[in-house]
């Protein structure tokens, strides 16, 4: 995995500024950062920027900065702030898969299977 830790400063910012994460545990926050970084790398590699001392991952309107020690040390979350928002297409299916694989407990989407065949039998 690309991310091995999250600093206290980044964790506090995440809790205070990212919706529905006020009481998130450090472990769950780290798993979400791992998922978000992987999603950017897999689906939008053009949104990864290598800097001198860190790598920036633009996940939607959130910038996740990872240092050389592979720790998330800064998060910036500002809606509509970044000019390249038009190139972001949310990868919902992969988001659900990674959330399940990593054991993220509060995935905002649930995979519901719906069979037309079963629906017709119930009529």
Swiss-Prot record:
<protein>
    <recommendedName>
        <fullName>SPbeta prophage-derived uncharacterized protein YorE</fullName>
    </recommendedName>
</protein>
